[in-house]
């Protein structure tokens, strides 16, 4: 097990993570994520195995980044853990949630949200709107913001913090 403690970061592709784990010399990688995306986690494991890495999928249910399976990954001698589905999460006091090298790969849902917004925006009676969302849709927040501002709305959003890494992000925990 590599003893170096890594800062926690969000990545947008497994290729970005592969670059870093290759640079660090990691050999065994744990993968964790929520039940709804287990098939995708298996796909990621296969990608890693094709590159020569040993993988272990942690099959226990995961309900968010506040439930990192770092201890399970360590017991399985993993050098790092890829947590798929959520963004980085810290304790309110700012301490890291884990002692293992954790990579966060948010899962992005591919549903078309803009067509719904374009079709129904004129039903919104308020002039000032709060733009919020869950991790799976936050990659489209800027597009929604721009659209609404072009239509004359004032759009506000929450700030990032210890628990959220994207403006307007809402957590389930």
Where are the predicted features?
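An N-terminal assembly and electron-transfer interface module characteristic of large anaerobic redox
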Residues: 1-173
């Amino acid at each position: 097990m590599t003893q170096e403690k890594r800062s926690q970061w969000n990545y947008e592709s497994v290729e970005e993570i592969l670059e870093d784990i290759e640079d660090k010399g990691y050999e065994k990688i744990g993968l964790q994520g929520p039940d709804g995306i287990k098939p995708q986690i298996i796909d990621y494991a296969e990608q890693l195995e094709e590159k020569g890495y040993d993988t272990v999928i942690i099959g226990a249910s995961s309900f968010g980044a506040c439930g990192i399976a770092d201890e399970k990954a360590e017991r399985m001698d993993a050098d790092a853990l890829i947590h798929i589905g959520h963004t980085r999460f810290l304790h309110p006091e700012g301490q890291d949630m884990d002692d293992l090298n954790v990579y966060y790969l948010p899962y992005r849902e591919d549903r078309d949200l803009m067509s719904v917004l374009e079709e129904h925006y004129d039903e919104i009676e308020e002039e000032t709107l709060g733009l919020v969302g869950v991790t799976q849709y936050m990659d489209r927040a800027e597009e929604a913001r721009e659209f609404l501002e072009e239509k004359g709305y004032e759009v506000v959003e929450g700030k990032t913090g210890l628990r959220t890494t994207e403006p307007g992000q809402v957590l389930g925990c």
